[in-house]
A protein has these predicted regions:
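Membrane-integrated ABC transporters
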Residues: 1-38, 47-97, 103, 110-115, ...
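Transmembrane helices of ABC transporter permease
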Residues: 21-28, 170-221, 294-307, 324
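Hydrophobic alpha-helical transmembrane segments of ABC transporter permease domains
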Residues: 24, 75, 85, 107, ...
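Juxtamembrane helix-loop junctions of ABC transporter transmembrane domains
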Residues: 32-41, 91, 96-147, 151, ...
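Short intracellular "coupling" helices and adjacent cytoplasmic loop segments at the cytosolic face
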Residues: 48-52, 120, 128-152, 156-158, ...
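Helix-loop-helix
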Residues: 185-199, 273-344, 349-350
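ABC-type nucleotide-binding domain
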Residues: 358-359, 365-609
Length: 609
């Protein structure tokens, strides 16, 4: 339960006023519920003409408050009966009973209503915390986690926390209040009978706790299967073209069926165990009622009766009212472990360490004036495999640098170090003589623009995709950027122009159009440093020409670092950096490297065959 209280402290604390309101409403509801049951005693006495006892008024503050209230209430009722007759008083008591029940149910509704903002607020806060954490984590974290698993945690696991934990908050606020108030009244009515009843409470709690512990372990396993399901759905949506091309529908369907069947089997066991909460608590409660009926009957039938029949019936009515709060607590005891299991999976994200640490006192870097310098940079992934080894490189401002090499040479890793998507294992990277680890990532990345081989667009309008990351961009600025990127003409041909939604990942556009939107976005940002990842590699000839024209304009006014897969595109580079197995093996202009007859020439000749 320690973990549960930590969750409440973490997420429910901002909603203290709602919790306080719920507590007040539940107390009022319980008090008026006791009043409604207390009215049963005089009603039963009138109906069955029971109780020859004569009540005398006790001055206030002369005895125990409970005794004063009870005695004087019966005194006034007996006086009214003498004056108005039992029939009229019975009608009055029944009307009062209805009014009390109306007040009680209104308080009950109020208690439930003030809990709604807590439930919805906790879920919203939790999702925002996970989402913000995802945005802050380095790229290395996501290379180790499946996207489907992350989606499952932000959707299914958070939903399970809502169903299993936040839904129990109301039970945990309301039911202890009801139980405490009811028990207090029961002790005042007959402490012997109540003490006898409490003896059975530890047995009920022990049975429910044993089932709850087993339920948590099974819930963790069930949520893992849910993650596997979401991961396969994500893979299927991303690879649908390949699945159809290779006639793999049946194979993927069988794989999905196996995962969902395993999840169904595990969920069956969890649901069956959770379903046992109600009948188990019902059985234990009924056994307790039966035993209390027997013991209470002996108290009434004994020579020295400590409770009369109408009071005993009211006692049993209140006691039976405790059964429902106890059953609710038992459901909470079964539900909380499921939520804790999901919370453990959520905490894998929330507690993940961000190794791209922000400096405590960041140095200012608002512009780029001199050079980018890599000093003896080495880098290894967490697996231990070294990707870069002792790389040193200086890129003066305004230079166009191309990085080439075979697949796996470390080209992409090298450029990912500059915006601090990763930090080098050894060595340092400096911009204008300032170590980039001493600069806030926000200031650093504001200086850098990216155009990737596979343009990353969002399910939004063309305008919003171009203006992405540029606060307050105007239509005039967006149009100007689109014209430079050779994108304006095809945009205005769309039915809604710049307000056209381009679909998921820009599926409504061609490859060349997507790339030109990506270039327009970089132009609008207008960064002094540009990183290109072979932006024309997958385009047809016409699209490549238009994209290359846009890139030429973009590159002419800034420092450019481009990864080149096709060596024919690097002829204009001021310097070509040739990499092999994580090291710089050659550098120079195209003609110089060809004349050198080394590794670059070998790569070039392989592509021109």
């Amino acid at each position: 339960m320690k973990e549960f209280w930590q969750i409440l402290k973490r997420y429910v604390a901002p909603y203290k006023k709602y919790v306080a309101g719920s507590v007040v409403m539940n107390i009022l509801s319980a008090v008026f519920n006791v009043f409604s049951f207390s009215l049963l005693i005089p009603i039963l006495q009138i109906l069955f003409n029971v109780g020859e006892h004569t009540y005398e008024f006790i001055p206030w503050h002369r005895g125990m408050p409970f005794n004063e209230i009870t005695n004087n209430a019966y005194y006034y009722i007996s006086q009214f009966i003498e004056v108005y007759g039992p029939s009229r008083i019975l009608l009055a008591l029944c009307l009062i009973f209805c009014v009390i029940v109306l007040i009680k149910t209104s308080c009950y509704f109020g208690a439930a209503a003030v809990m709604v903002p807590i439930r919805t607020g906790v879920v919203k806060d939790m999702r925002m915390e996970i989402y913000d954490k995802i945005l802050s984590l380095p790229l290395g974290f996501f290379s180790q986690e499946r996207k489907g698993d992350i989606i499952a945690r932000i959707s299914g696991d958070v939903q399970e926390v809502e169903n299993s934990i936040t839904s129990t908050i109301e039970m945990l606020i309301k039911n202890p209040i009801l139980i405490i108030i009811y028990l207090t009244v029961l002790f005042r009515m007959s402490w012997e009978l109540t003490l006898f009843t409490i003896v059975f409470a530890p047995a009920m709690i022990g049975v429910m706790s044993a089932i709850a512990r087993k339920l948590k372990a099974q819930s963790i396993e069930a949520q893992r299967y849910w993650s596997d399901t979401m991961s396969q759905v994500e893979e299927t949506l991303g690879g649908l073209r390949i699945i159809k091309a290779f006639l793999a529908e049946k194979k993927m369907s069988d794989r999905f069926d196996a995962v969902t069947e395993a999840m169904r089997s595990k969920n069956n066991r969890v649901a069956i165990r959770q379903a046992s909460a109600h009948p188990v608590s019902e059985l234990l409660g009924s056994v307790m009622i039966a035993i209390v009926l027997w013991f209470g009957g002996t108290l009434i039938l004994g020579e020295h009766s400590v409770i009369d029949a109408p009071s005993f019936m009211a006692y049993m009515a209140i006691l039976y009212s405790i059964i429902q709060p106890i059953k609710d607590l038992s459901r909470a005891a079964y539900g909380i472990p499921k939520g804790l299991a999901s919370m453990e999976r959520i905490n894998v994200i929330l507690d993940a360490e961000n190794n791209i640490a922000e400096p405590a006192e960041p140095r200012s870097l608002s512009s780029f004036e001199q050079s980018i310098e890599l000093r003896n940079v080495s880098f290894s992934y967490e697996s231990g495999r070294e990707v870069l080894h002792d790389v040193s490189l200086t890129i003066p401002k305004g230079r166009n640098i191309a990085i080439v090499g075979a697949s796996g040479a470390g080209k992409s890793t090298l450029v990912d170090l500059i915006p601090r998507f990763y930090d080098p294992t050894d060595g340092s990277i400096l911009i204008d003589g300032v170590d980039i680890r001493e600069v806030s990532t926000r200031d650093l990345r504001a200086l850098i623009g990216n155009v990737n081989q596979d343009p990353i667009l969002f399910n939004d309008t063309i305008f919003n995709n171009i203006a992405f990351g540029v606060e307050g961009a105007t239509m005039e600025q967006v149009v100007a950027a689109a014209k430079i990127a050779n994108a304006h003409d095809f945009i205005i041909e769309k039915p809604e122009g710049y307000d056209t939604n381009i679909g998921d990942r820009g599926v409504m556009l061609s490859g060349g159009q997507r790339q030109r939107i990506s270039i327009a976005r970089a132009i609008l940002k207008n960064p002094p440093i540009l990183i290109l990842d072979e932006a024309t590699a997958s385009l047809d000839t016409e699209s490549e020409r238009m994209v290359q024209d846009a890139l030429d304009y973009l590159m002419s006014q800034r420092t450019t670092i481009s990864i080149a897969h096709r060596l024919s595109t690097v002829r204009k580079a001021d310097e070509i950096i040739v990499m092999n197995e994580g090291r710089i093996v050659e550098r120079g202009r195209h003609d110089e490297l060809i004349a050198l007859g080394g590794y670059y020439r070998k790569l070039y000749e392989m592509q021109t065959l």
